[in-house]
Amino acid sequence: MDTPLGSIGMIICFDVEFPEIARTLKLMKAGFMVTVNINMHPYELHHHLFSRCRAMENEIPVMICNRLGTEGEFDFCGDSMVIDATEEILLSLKDKEQVKTVSLPIKQELDPMRSYTANRRADMYDILTK
């Protein structure tokens, strides 16, 4: 989705656990990603790990909006967060409904020695499409 701030890549829930989707959004020039989740206990570690990985490996910020509360047998863990391009968590809302703001560096200075984008080997990806 194109905005005055740049292109936003949208990911829905479980899709954040697959690196190919986030990489495709990065290659389509997404400047940052937004993930809408309904992650529940005991899987809160999953959205932490995968979201931080997607930010780091694609060198773009990731925002996670996760449901909070209980419905039937499901206990949703909340913990919406904003992660910068170096995988640092800038904001975490934990387990309360809150509204907060955070300054997000859209064009962040990154360590060129740790550039996953520059060092990717697309010539080795053929096996992934089989």
Explain the meaning of each model-derived region.
Residues 1-58, 63-64:
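Active-site beta-loop-alpha substructure in enzyme catalytic cores
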Residues 67-130:
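C-terminal beta-strand edge segments of enzyme domains
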